[in-house]
């Protein structure tokens, strides 16, 4: 008897996705390069419709045609090696789905190469971590649409469900579109986390709040317009005590790790010419956090103001909340502008409002305000920037004074706020009809004869700036 779908790679994500698929009524074949993980899967899957295999040949032959194979192996060379091993065993029309944390450019390359072998290829972003993989992730599949249609029922079944019952999956677009959108999703996630961390720093360093008060603040915020998974778990984190009944978070070394997708997002923005300042500052913030020894030494050598606050703490806490929400809006505005430009350049025809909808559940950046993004693009499909949507425009108009005050207070007290600072600078730059770039153009023309355009007449000009 043949199985309906196969999963290669039985680390935690592959294993949990296989169980998720099986729980929706599908029969699943599994294979792992090391047989020990396959044996463990068998032991843990008693009573489930999971079919173990111990060679690629056995695995491929166990699947109904056209074969549907989900690859959950390490991104990069391991994925290429697995595909190369599979190719001689596959038939025309079989479907490979790469659910790994893959660079979208690799997906474009693989899509093109496999098309020549008549193999359908889907690059699919998977968000939600190991729990999401088991209970329902947000899925971002890209590739041939006809191939997607053949696996749509399975993906729809295993995806997270929003409160209105809609599955958090949709066809994203051709070739690398799915993994590209997942990359930007991860970049936005970096910014969300950095902005929340800066809010915590202000509460702790400036307002002197206890971990209990910080936890309660995030729980209160999660009941309003900031409602989101990351705000929710932040409240939980501050309630967790260690073996000494002290806040565990305060014992964690302040060096933030990363897997590189935030960096990919920033590099791509540079290539596109898109200002992705908030996400990029969030990547840099992780870099500077990683040089702990240098920072400790610098703290003994470099002086600055000592944080102190003698104002109304309740009032300032509300300003932090507003600063966080406005900065979040600016960050998403940048991320969606990046996806809009990439869609145009690659002819992906991304439906930006639909992307917001599939992030409502299952993924790390799930948040209440994603519905507002969907509404914005429904009202104006050609919207250039989320800040120009009436809802978001009203919010940033009302909240900008709070953000300015938070940034200024942070600077005056030596509390770093790279994300908040980048947000207000982006907002002010974006709304500026005139920027001092005219001087930069004059300088470029002065030393390099790069020429310039003028406001008052047509043409391209060069000036001899000093007389010989």
From Swiss-Prot:
PROSITE patterns: 6PGD
Catalytic activity: 6-phospho-D-gluconate + NADP(+) = D-ribulose 5-phosphate + CO2 + NADPH
EC class: oxidoreductase
Binding, NADP(+): 9-14, 32-34, 73-75, 101
Enzyme Commission (EC) number: 1.1.1.44
Statement: the UniProt record of this protein carries the keyword Oxidoreductase: yes
Binding site for substrate: 101, 127-129, 185-186, 190, 259, 286, 444, 450
Coiled-coil regions listed: none
Active site: 182, 189
Alphabetical list of Pfam families matching this protein: 6PGD, NAD_binding_2
Keywords for the protein's UniProt record, in alphabetical order: Gluconate utilization, NADP, Oxidoreductase, Pentose shunt
Alphabetized InterPro entries for the sequence: 6-PGluconate_DH-like_C_sf (IPR008927), 6PGD_dom2 (IPR013328), 6PGDH_C (IPR006114), 6PGDH_Gnd/GntZ (IPR006113), 6PGDH_NADP-bd (IPR006115), 6PGdom_BS (IPR006184), NAD(P)-bd_dom_sf (IPR036291), Pgluconate_DH (IPR006183)
SMART domains in UniProt: 6PGD
Entry's Gene Ontology molecular function annotations: NADP binding; phosphogluconate dehydrogenase (decarboxylating) activity
GO biological process, one term: organic acid catabolic process
Record pathway: Carbohydrate degradation; pentose phosphate pathway; D-ribulose 5-phosphate from D-glucose 6-phosphate (oxidative stage): step 3/3
Assigned protein family: Belongs to the 6-phosphogluconate dehydrogenase family.
Summary of subunit composition and partner proteins: Homodimer.
Function per UniProt: Catalyzes the oxidative decarboxylation of 6-phosphogluconate to ribulose 5-phosphate and CO(2), with concomitant reduction of NADP to NADPH.
PANTHER family referenced in this protein's UniProt entry, alphabetically: 6-PHOSPHOGLUCONATE DEHYDROGENASE
Name of the featured protein: 6-phosphogluconate dehydrogenase, decarboxylating
Native source organism of the sequence: Staphylococcus aureus (strain N315)
């Amino acid at each position: 008897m043949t199985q309906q779908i196969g999963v290669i790679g039985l680390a935690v994500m592959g294993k949990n996705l296989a169980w998720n698929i099986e729980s929706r009524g599908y029969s699943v074949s599994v294979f792992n390069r090391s047989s020990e993980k396959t044996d463990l899967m068998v032991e843990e899957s008693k009573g489930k419709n999971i079919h173990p295999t111990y060679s690629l040949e056995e695995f491929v032959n166990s699947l109904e045609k056209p074969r549907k194979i989900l690859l959950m192996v390490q991104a990069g060379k391991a994925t290429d090696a697995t595909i190369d091993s599979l190719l001689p065993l596959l038939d025309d029309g079989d479907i490979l789905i790469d659910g790994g944390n893959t660079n979208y450019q690799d997906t474009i390359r693989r899509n093109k190469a496999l098309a020549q072998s008549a193999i359908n290829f889907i690059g699919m972003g998977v968000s939600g971590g190991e729990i999401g993989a088991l209970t329902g992730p947000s899925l971002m599949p890209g590739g041939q649409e006809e191939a997607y249609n053949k696996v749509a029922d399975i993906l729809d079944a295993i995806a997270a469900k929003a409160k209105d019952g809609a599955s958090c999956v949709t066809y994203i677009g051709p070739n690398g579109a799915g993994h590209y959108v997942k990359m930007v999703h991860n970049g936005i996630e970096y910014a969300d986390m950095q902005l929340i961390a800066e809010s915590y720093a202000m509460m702790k360093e400036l307002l002197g709040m206890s971990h209990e008060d910080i936890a309660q603040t995030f729980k209160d915020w999660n009941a309003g317009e900031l409602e989101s998974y990351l705000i929710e778990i932040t409240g939980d984190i501050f309630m967790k005590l260690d073996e000494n009944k002290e806040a565990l978070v305060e014992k964690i070394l302040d060096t933030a790790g990363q897997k590189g997708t935030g960096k990919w997002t920033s590099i791509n923005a540079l290539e596109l010419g898109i200002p992705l300042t908030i996400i990029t500052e969030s990547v840099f913030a992780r870099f500077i956090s990683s040089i702990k020894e240098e920072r400790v030494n610098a703290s003994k050598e470099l002086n600055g103001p000592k944080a102190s606050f003698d104002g109304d703490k309740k009032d300032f806490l509300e300003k932090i909340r507003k600063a966080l929400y406005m900065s979040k809006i600016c960050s998403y505005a940048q991320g969606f502008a990046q996806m809009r430009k990439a869609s145009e350049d690659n002819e992906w025809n991304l439906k930006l409002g639909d992307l917001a909808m599939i992030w409502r559940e299952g993924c790390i950046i799930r948040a209440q305000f994603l519905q507002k993004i969907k509404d914005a693009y429904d009202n104006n499909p050609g919207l250039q920037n989320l800040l120009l949507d009436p809802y978001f425009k009203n919010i940033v108009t009302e909240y900008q004074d709070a953000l300015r005050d938070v940034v200024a207070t942070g600077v005056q007290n030596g509390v770093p706020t790279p994300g908040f600072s980048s947000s207000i600078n982006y907002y002010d730059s974006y709304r500026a009809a005139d920027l001092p770039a005219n001087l930069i153009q004059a300088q470029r023309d002065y030393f390099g004869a790069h020429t310039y355009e003028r406001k008052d007449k047509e043409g391209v000009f060069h000036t001899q700036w000093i007389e010989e």
